[in-house]
């Protein structure tokens, strides 16, 4: 027979701690400076900001104001901030009063202190300051019925005493009546469990980083832990875990208190449930049934029972937390009360909770022996990246947004701030910025929906930073999912049927596209996907839904996501001998769903290669990008600006509509003329028109405008044209070296040949040239340079352009004008400088 373990007495006086908790709740007042510091540091998770504002205005105790709102049914959660307790302890220390280390005690035994705080709150709960109808809640109805029953019991007891001549009707009630009243009141207080009458959920908020640094005792680490670092000595303690949420169950009702009704005496019997399993009561335990020796049968009263929202989540280690050669570990999280639905799959979070064991029950207990499962009972959640929809547009956020606008050139600055360590690719970064902002969703009266999300495909040679751009977008986007084509199946992208471990029901587990709802799904190695898996994306890219019919489940899931795909051409590298469609090797049905398709070619160029090599070597040497001519915008500020821009819903005026229609007709005609050429990209489809509209709306959002301007449409057309022109190489090498001035001259000369006259309207020239993606500065330089060469002149106060030789010149003269850079050196130099200073980055045709 084994000897008993020695008993020890812990030096913990819980009565003294309970008195300190009561004093803290009643007397604590938060100073303005500390509350502002806490709000600035924890701006994302300020759940009780309204209560802080209220008590600061009233200059009263913070938690008593919070309890008053609980009593008035305006608040259903009480958040105990450990920063406030630490401030309370410091104030007691400065006053010369020795107080126990309450913060350390809560961190080491959080589960027990939850009950202590609840008892202190119950004892100090104020009366409601507004009238509350007893019909509002089921518990109010039960309490009201119990109060009426007690009054009847008192009346019956009074009549019984009078009938027994124990008192005279003219005399005051004797002590027996007071004793009977006291017994009835005590029975009422003992009848209802404390957990049944509580109308709030209590949570602990961990120490902030500033307070944790100043905290003298480091018994519990305030830094977030990985799942691998959680050991057995953390059981019962308040810890913080950092990871990514991989699975979230449905919200189910979890029973806390079960109410039974006896069929003999009519009494209510309550049973508290503190575990996952329980044994229902069957026999009545009331005093009346015991005295009458009648075994009344209990029937469960579901309406009088108390249920709370329950959700089970699974958190997994981040990739940087996993050692070499290991697989990520995971931990179950139990979420109760008002914290449910605060976690979503794919979120990177810091979850503060109580680390508790869950012993095996049933047959598992016989096999597992002393082993137990562990879980984290969530107390507080801090999101690393807030969703765009959950951004609170406070005055501080608006001030930072306006500061960014006043700095000027927001469009180019934000685009350059996307992965500044990656050299060049400014137009690609501009398209990715518009993808982050998105267009405007439209819903027609008959229910048809027009998507506003923008889809972009990056196709190019290996080593041009496609994957790095994808990961940069995932980092900036609050809800970004990164996956690869070969490592993803159709089920992994859409949804899979699996068994719920909580309820053992068949449920749908969302894939990458569902997890990226209201976000961005980045798919790398898009060309390596199987054709059967790639077809699952067709519905998502246009209809933004996923239709599922499997395992008896017929439903439609939302996948309101933007697709950012990266792919390599056929045979790995771009082959200039093949047409662009052959190089791209994607079906036309999928190709037309992309608003922009960039081809990023790795073309040898001495100047570009030298700049790229210098950039890469500098990054390797200093672990940062070279000094830029601007200050990159931080990802957090960029998210705030994009969230602010997403609140705008710009519309198009009649003039802009006509301009878009004419531009689309010209695109269709150009694609029709190029259909027979070797370098044809394909037919321009109506989806191209919708893509131009979405890009224009995104540009208007970036300007924080309510109307789409013609300049927005022109920039969208320029991006579309640049993306189209980058899909093929010109066979004539000399055309690649043409300056913008020469290209504009070619366009005007072609217009002259089509009209057959020697004059052109300056307004038509401006419209055509800007439609081709050139700026007014470049057009002005072109007209000035060729006027100096006596090729044309502006007449009629600048409204008409007239050719000197009736537009007819021989081939030798034309070639000399186009290819002679030495004429008018000052004008040419000024044109080149102006082109470099232009906001629009031109690509070679």
Swiss-Prot record:
Its EC number is 3.6.4.12. GO terms for cellular component: chromosome, telomeric region; CMG complex; cytoplasm; DNA replication preinitiation complex; MCM complex; MCM core complex; nuclear pre-replicative complex; nuclear replication fork. Residues 825-837 have a biased composition (Polar residues). The modification Phosphothreonine is found at residue 811. It catalyses: ATP + H2O = ADP + phosphate + H(+). ATP 2 binds at residues 593, 687. The modification Phosphoserine is found at residues 819, 838. ATP 1 binds at residues 423, 463, 465-467, 568. GO terms for biological process: DNA replication; DNA replication initiation; DNA strand elongation involved in DNA replication; double-strand break repair via break-induced replication; nuclear DNA replication; pre-replicative complex assembly involved in nuclear cell cycle DNA replication; premeiotic DNA replication; silent mating-type cassette heterochromatin formation. InterPro entries: AAA+_ATPase (IPR003593), MCM (IPR031327), MCM7 (IPR008050), MCM_CS (IPR018525), MCM_dom (IPR001208), MCM_lid (IPR041562), MCM_N (IPR027925), MCM_OB (IPR033762). Residues 410-617 form the MCM domain. It comes from the Eukaryota. It is an enzyme of class 3 (hydrolase). SUPFAM superfamilies: Nucleic acid-binding proteins, P-loop containing nucleoside triphosphate hydrolases. A motif (Arginine finger) lies at residues 592-595. Keywords: ATP-binding, Cell cycle, Cytoplasm, DNA replication, DNA-binding, Helicase, Hydrolase, Nucleotide-binding, Nucleus, Phosphoprotein. One of its GO terms (molecular function) is DNA replication origin binding. Present with 166 molecules/cell in log phase SD medium. Early fractionation of eukaryotic MCM proteins yielded a variety of dimeric, trimeric and tetrameric complexes with unclear biological significance. Specifically a MCM467 subcomplex is shown to have in vitro helicase activity which is inhibited by the MCM2 subunit. The MCM2-7 hexamer is the proposed physiological active complex. Belongs to the MCM family. Acts as a component of the MCM2-7 complex (MCM complex) which is the putative replicative helicase essential for 'once per cell cycle' DNA replication initiation and elongation in eukaryotic cells. Core component of CDC45-MCM-GINS (CMG) helicase, the molecular machine that unwinds template DNA during replication, and around which the replisome is built. This is DNA replication licensing factor MCM7. It comes from Saccharomyces cerevisiae (strain ATCC 204508 / S288c) (Baker's yeast).
């Amino acid at each position: 027979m084994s000897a008993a373990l020695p008993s020890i007495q812990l030096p913990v006086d819980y009565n003294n701690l309970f008195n300190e908790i009561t004093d803290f709740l009643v007397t604590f007042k938060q100073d303005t400076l500390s509350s502002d510091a806490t709000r600035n540091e924890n701006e994302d998770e300020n759940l009780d900001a309204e209560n802080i504002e209220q008590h600061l205005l009233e200059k009263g105790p913070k938690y008593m104001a919070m309890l008053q709102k609980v009593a008035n049914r305006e608040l259903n959660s009480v958040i105990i901030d450990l920063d406030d307790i630490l401030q309370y302890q410091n104030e007691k220390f400065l006053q010369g009063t020795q107080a126990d280390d309450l913060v350390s005690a809560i961190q080491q035994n959080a589960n027990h202190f939850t009950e202590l705080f609840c008892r202190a709150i119950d004892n100090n709960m104020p009366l409601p300051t507004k009238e509350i109808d007893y019909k509002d809640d089921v518990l109010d109805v039960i309490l009201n019925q119990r109060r009426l029953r007690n009054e009847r019991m008192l009346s019956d007891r009074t009549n019984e005493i009078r009938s027994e001549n124990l008192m005279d009707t003219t005399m005051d009630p004797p002590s027996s009546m007071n004793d009977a009243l006291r017994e009835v009141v005590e029975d009422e207080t003992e009848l209802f469990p404390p957990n049944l009458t509580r109308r709030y959920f209590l949570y602990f908020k961990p120490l902030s980083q500033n307070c944790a640094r100043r905290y003298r005792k480091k018994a519990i680490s305030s830094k977030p832990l990985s799942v691998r670092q959680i050991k057995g000595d953390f059981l019962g303690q308040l810890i913080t875990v950092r990871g990514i949420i991989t699975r979230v169950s449905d919200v189910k009702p979890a029973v806390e208190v079960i109410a039974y009704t006896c069929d003999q005496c009519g009494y209510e019997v309550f049973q508290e449930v503190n575990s996952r399993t329980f044994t229902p009561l069957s026999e009545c335990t009331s005093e009346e049934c015991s005295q009458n020796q009648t075994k009344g049968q209990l029937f469960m009263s579901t309406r009088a029972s108390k249920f709370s929202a329950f959700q089970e989540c699974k958190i997994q280690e981040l990739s940087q937390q996993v050692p070499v050669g290991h697989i990520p570990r995971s931990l179950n999280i139990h979420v109760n009360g008002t914290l449910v639905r605060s976690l979503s799959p794919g979120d990177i979070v810091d979850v503060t909770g109580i680390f508790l064991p869950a012993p095996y029950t049933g047959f598992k207990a016989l096999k597992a022996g002393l082993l137990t499962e562990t879980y984290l009972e969530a107390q507080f959640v801090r999101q690393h990246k807030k969703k765009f929809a959950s951004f609170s547009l406070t005055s501080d956020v608006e001030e930072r947004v306006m500061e960014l606008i006043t700095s000027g050139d927001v469009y180019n600055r934000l685009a350059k701030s996307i992965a500044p360590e990656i050299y060049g690719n400014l137009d690609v970064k501009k398209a990715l910025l518009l993808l982050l902002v998105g267009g405007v969703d439209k819903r027609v009266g008959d229910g048809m929906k027009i998507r506003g999300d923008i889809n972009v495909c990056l196709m190019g040679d290996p080593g041009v930073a496609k994957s790095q751009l994808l990961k940069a977008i995932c980092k900036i986007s609050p809800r970004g999912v990164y996956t690869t084509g070969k490592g993803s199946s159709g089920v992994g992208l859409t949804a899979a049927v699996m068994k719920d471990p909580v309820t053992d029901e068949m449920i749908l587990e969302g894939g990458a596209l569902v997890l990226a709802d209201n976000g961005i799904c980045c798919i790398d190695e898009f060309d390596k996907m199987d054709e059967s898996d790639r077809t699952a994306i067709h519905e998502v890219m246009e209809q933004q839904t996923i239709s599922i019919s499997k395992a008896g489940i017929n439903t439609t899931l939302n996948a309101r996501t933007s697709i950012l795909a990266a792919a390599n051409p056929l045979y790995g590298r771009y082959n200039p001998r093949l047409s662009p469609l052959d190089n791209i090797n994607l079906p036309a049905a999928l190709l037309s769903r992309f608003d922009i398709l960039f081809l990023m070619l790795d073309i040898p160029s001495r100047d570009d290669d030298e700049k790229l090599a210098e950039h890469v070597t500098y990054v390797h040497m200093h672990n940062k990008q070279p000094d830029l001519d601007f200050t990159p915008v931080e990802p957090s500020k960029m998210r705030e600006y994009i969230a602010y821009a997403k609140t705008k819903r710009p519309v198009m005026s009649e003039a802009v509509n006509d301009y878009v229609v004419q531009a689309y007709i010209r695109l269709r005609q150009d694609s029709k003329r190029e259909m027979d050429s070797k370098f044809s990209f394909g037919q321009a489809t109506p989806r191209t028109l919708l893509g131009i509209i979405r890009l224009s709306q995104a540009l208007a959002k970036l300007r924080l405008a309510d109307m789409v301007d013609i300049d927005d449409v022109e920039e969208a057309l320029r991006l579309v044209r640049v993306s189209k022109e980058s899909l093929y190489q010109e066979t004539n090498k000399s055309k690649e070296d043409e300056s913008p001035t020469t290209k504009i001259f070619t366009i005007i000369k072609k217009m002259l040949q089509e009209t057959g006259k020697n004059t052109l309207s300056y307004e038509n020239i401006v419209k055509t040239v800007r439609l081709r993606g050139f700026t007014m500065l470049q057009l002005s330089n072109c007209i000035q340079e060729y006027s100096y060469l006596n090729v044309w002149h502006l007449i009629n106060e600048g409204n008409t352009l007239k050719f000197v030789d009736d537009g007819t010149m021989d081939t030798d003269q034309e070639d000399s004008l186009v290819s002679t850079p030495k004429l008018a050196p000052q004008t040419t130099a000024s044109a080149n400088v102006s082109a470099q200073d232009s906001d629009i980055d031109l690509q070679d045709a």
